[in-house]
Amino acid sequence: MISQFYDWLEVRTGVGEFVRNKKAQAVPANVYFYCFGGISFFIILMQVLTGVFMLFFYTANPQEALQSIEYMSNEVSFGWLFRNAHRWGSTLLLATVLTHMVTVFYRKAYRNPREFNWISGVLQFLVVFLFVVSGIILPWDWRAYWSYAIWVDYVATWPIIGEPVKNVLLDTFTIYRIFMIHVVILPIILFLLLYFHFVMIKKHGISEPL
């Protein structure tokens, strides 16, 4: 019965052939550190799943944001698990993406013809960093308040554009806008970059280690 179901699924989806083709692709030897790219992608998928769960309970306004987080953590079944998995997953994602970038840079895998792989990877790191910063702000507790204040003051130190950008950040700040950036704008940007990154990897393959 299982084989019949597999045959039925294979005819309609071709998933078996897809898996066989992926397993048959040649991978250069001694590229174990390259696995941090795949680990990062797996963590991104986990962040999506835990984030969708949190969407059902989080309230994006200053008066109820922290209360909704506390309710989810203390009253909802397994809410504490999903929240902590999301919180610690963000830190782990930042670490694995950075490790992947350092490995690629050290092995000079960014060189011709893989410059666009490197550029899209750097942009993905920046997007992940913005995910972490915006995620810290969303509970809107004392840590969120001072994190935003510190980042705004840091932006003000930028030459020429610092003060104008600081004013925009202060004048347009609302928890709801940060929430929309975190759950709509940044995910769209990240998955577009991921798609481009995977297309480039498919086109050029994995770089041979030096």
List PLM regions with ranges:
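Membrane-embedded alpha-helical bundles that constitute the cytochrome b-like, heme-associated redox core
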Residues: M1-L210
